Amino acid sequence: MKVTCEVEDIMANWPKVRYAIQQASLIVPEKERDVLVYNTACEILTGHRKIWILHDGVNIKAIVGAVIQKSGGAESVPSIIISPIFGFTPMTVEDKELLKKGLMDFARNNKCNVIYGYSANPKAWVIAEKIGMTFVAKVYKWEVV
């Protein structure tokens, strides 16, 4: 399930984001809706930034942003820098696996590396822990994993 939405600032355009999620849910048969739509990480395209939203059908559980850019080195490789924005707990094991799978599938389909970035935001740390990610660098220093 892919949702695209022209949004420059996710928080400033929150009603538009919620509307995009609601519209996505309408194209799925009702009996499959909870599983197929709200328990997947919906992608909302915001310029060069990808936003994954994990929704349980009632509340949004997590929002993770990822910037796609070229990494340095001998060969410039497209990379996803994962930068969690905020999230809510609790997230189940299934939740974290779905969210992680969405990110990894996107990376594989677009031949990207995955880079984890540091954030001092306590809510960002919660997301990192819940989806099994480890921050491997501090501010402005990145490490490919």
Pin down the residues of each PLM region.
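Membrane-anchoring hydrophobic segments
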Residues: Q23-E30, L45-H48, R108
